[in-house]
Amino acid sequence: MSGYLVMFVADEADDGHADAMRETARGLRGAGFFDDPDLGGQRTTGTYLETDTLEDPVALELIARVSELSDALACRIEVQHREIILGHIVYGQPDEQLAAVLGFGGP
């Protein structure tokens, strides 16, 4: 069963975040971009990829690109797969919850 990897700005987002997310997804096979400036009063902007597993090389590349974006824009990104919150990327680094899901060792 296929699912979606979804990553979006968890902080207040603006046009700069939207432009950066669009560029992050561009050129990556299967990756998409979304931007809803009025969802519940807070702008929601992010990227997605249909993927069965987080081990998919394209999924890993998208996570890496979004991590770089998070660091460059000093923002927090929520990461979901199959509509389950996996954790956050904070200023380019996975939080403890996301690091465990991705199999990264502790600090």
Question: Model-derived features: where do they sit?
Answer:
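Short, flexible, solvent-exposed loop/turn segments with mixed acidic/basic and small polar residues
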Residues: 1-4, 34-42
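Short, extreme N-terminal segment that most often corresponds to the first beta-strand
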Residues: 1-26
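Charged interaction segments
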Residues: 24-32, 41-107
